[in-house]
């Protein structure tokens, strides 16, 4: 029968035909990511080198859209490649169908050249829709082994949003081909109903009015639950079957959205009040200094001490005389004005008795001194006068004040003041003192005399390095050194005795 009949009518032909059908079905369902798919001999004979249409897009493998039904909303691309009468061997009939096929192929290739990349859709919805269509075709074609539709080129069913449209004066064109290259991705995402494109549009125009921004946000948030589920499924599918032509940012998971219904809307007054209260709350929040109770108490004590003045030597009272800063930080200084006020009796309510100690040498003291001042230039004389028989005030509320000075109050006066304080500390238990208030006249007799000459006796001034008193100066200095040496020796002996005693 194989010899008398037409070629390929025997069992061998059927087995070969079944292998071709299985090969086509395997290629259809495998969905390989390679962009270079080898064409079958049948495709090469039908379409030539243009059978591999996925090379035109440079992305994932793609197939021709089905343009079979223009009027009903879906059309198959095989209308342009009109199905020719194939013989049982899969070859074209040499009758008039060749001209129809060539004309259809040329028109089909013309459409592909107009929009090669846009015609090959790669959206996730199109993949899902096309896959369902192809499963139906494959199931129906399993029982039709010997029919000619097994040799038809593979069809890709497009999404209904990507149908071809006919312009007034031109052929059928894809709506994606009307977009420019920059708006291609936005167009595809718009058909998907994805919120990503809408968010980017809001970012491009940040200076919109409040009303317009609210309208746009309402439109974005008014998604139904069904549309949200479709968007989630499509975005999850795009992670597996994403076209290389799409940017990587679209491969990221979708943004979370809150369903907002039309009936549940806030009035404008409530929104404005909420915004104003939120802004006031943010303004009220700020960095504030935290102060503990202990810090407050210490600060108050320091402020009180600074306002009241420094304390006296036994820390029991505040100094009766106003003090100023001087050369030695451990001593308290007073101005010539304060000493003049002390002499005039302005502090009688606080002071029972005061002493002005002139620490200069005798010839300086005789040359001019402050009224009522005592000339004590050696430490022995000072200790004998104040410590042998300490002076105690009769009124416990009043005080006894001692003011030291020399020519400039730089060396001799401060040294005598420290000597008296040391001896007083040694004789009393800390912090008790016989003479807690000791002062230094700032500037000495040199500054006091020009301003208050009437308070000096005699009203003259004799400097330490006077030409007429050089010999007396040497004698006083040697005497002071001897007294100083004797005092240091006595101190060392006292320390040794203290260490030896049990």
UniProtKB/Swiss-Prot annotation:
It is found in: Nucleus. The modification Phosphothreonine is found at residues 40, 60, 123. Keywords: Cell cycle, Cell division, Hydrolase, Mitosis, Nucleus, Phosphoprotein, Protein phosphatase. The keyword Phosphoprotein applies. It catalyses: O-phospho-L-tyrosyl-[protein] + H2O = L-tyrosyl-[protein] + phosphate. GO terms for cellular component: cytoplasm; nucleus. CDD domains: Cdc25. InterPro entries: MPI_Phosphatase (IPR000751), Rhodanese-like_dom (IPR001763), Rhodanese-like_dom_sf (IPR036873). The modification Phosphoserine is found at residues 12, 30, 50, 54, 57, 115, 122, 194, 217, 224, 243, 245, 501. Residues 126-150 are annotated as: Disordered. The active site is at residue 406. GO terms for molecular function: protein tyrosine phosphatase activity. Functions as a dosage-dependent inducer in mitotic control. Tyrosine protein phosphatase required for progression of the cell cycle. When phosphorylated, highly effective in activating G2 cells into prophase. Directly dephosphorylates CDK1 and activates its kinase activity. Interacts with MAPK14 and 14-3-3 proteins. When phosphorylated on Ser-122 and/or Thr-123, interacts with PLK1. Interacts with MARK3/C-TAK1. This is M-phase inducer phosphatase 3. It comes from Sus scrofa. The gene is CDC25C.
């Amino acid at each position: 029968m194989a010899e008398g009949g037409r070629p390929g009518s025997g069992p061998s032909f059927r087995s070969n035909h079944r292998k071709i059908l299985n090969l086509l079905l395997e290629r259809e369902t495998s969905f390989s990511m390679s962009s270079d798919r080898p064409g079958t001999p049948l495709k090469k004979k039908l379409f030539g080198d243009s059978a591999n249409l996925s090379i035109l897009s440079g992305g994932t493998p793609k197939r021709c859209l089905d343009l079979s039904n223009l009027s009903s909303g879906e059309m198959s691309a095989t209308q342009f490649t009109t199905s020719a009468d194939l013989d049982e061997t899969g070859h074209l009939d040499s009758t008039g169908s060749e001209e129809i096929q060539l004309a259809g192929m040329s028109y089909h290739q013309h459409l592909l050249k107009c929009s090669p990349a846009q015609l090959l859709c790669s959206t996730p919805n199109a993949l899902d829709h096309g896959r369902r269509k192809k499963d139906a075709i494959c199931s129906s074609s399993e029982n039709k082994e010997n029919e000619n539709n097994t040799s038809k080129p593979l069809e890709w069913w497009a999404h209904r949003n990507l149908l071809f449209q006919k312009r007034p004066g031109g052929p059928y064109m894809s709506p994606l081909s009307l977009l420019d290259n920059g708006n291609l991705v936005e167009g595809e995402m718009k058909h998907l109903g994805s919120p990503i494109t809408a968010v980017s549009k809001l970012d491009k125009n940040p200076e919109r009015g409040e009303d317009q921004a609210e309208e746009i946000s309402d439109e974005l948030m008014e998604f139904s639950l069904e549309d949200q589920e479709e968007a989630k499924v499509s975005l999850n599918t795009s992670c597996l079957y994403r076209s290389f032509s799409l940017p990587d940012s679209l491969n990221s998971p979708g943004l979370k959205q809150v369903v907002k219904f039309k009936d549940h809307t806030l009035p404008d007054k409530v929104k404005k009040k909420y915004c104003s209260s939120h802004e006031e709350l943010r303004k009220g929040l700020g960095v504030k200094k935290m102060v503990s109770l202990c810090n407050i108490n210490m600060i108050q004590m320091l402020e009180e001490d600074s306002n009241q003045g420094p304390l006296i030597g036994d820390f029991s009272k505040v100094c009766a005389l106003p003090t100023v800063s001087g050369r030695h930080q451990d001593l308290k200084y007073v101005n010539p004005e304060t000493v003049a006020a002390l002499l005039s009796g302005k502090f009688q309510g606080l002071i029972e008795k005061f002493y002005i100690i002139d620490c200069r040498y005798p010839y300086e003291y005789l040359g001019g001194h402050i009224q009522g001042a005592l000339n004590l230039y050696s430490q022995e004389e000072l200790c004998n006068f104040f410590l042998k028989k300490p002076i105690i005030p009769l009124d416990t509320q009043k005080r006894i004040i001692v003011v030291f000075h020399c020519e400039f109050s730089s060396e001799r006066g401060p040294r005598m003041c420290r000597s008296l304080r040391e001896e007083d500390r040694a004789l009393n238990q800390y912090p008790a003192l016989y003479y807690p208030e000791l002062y230094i006249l700032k500037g000495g007799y040199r500054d006091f005399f020009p301003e208050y000459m009437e308070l000096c006796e005699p009203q003259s001034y004799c400097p330490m390095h006077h030409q007429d008193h050089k010999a007396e100066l040497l004698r006083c200095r040697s005497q002071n050194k001897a007294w100083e040496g004797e005092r240091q020796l006595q101190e060392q002996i006292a320390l040794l005795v203290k260490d030896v005693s049990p």
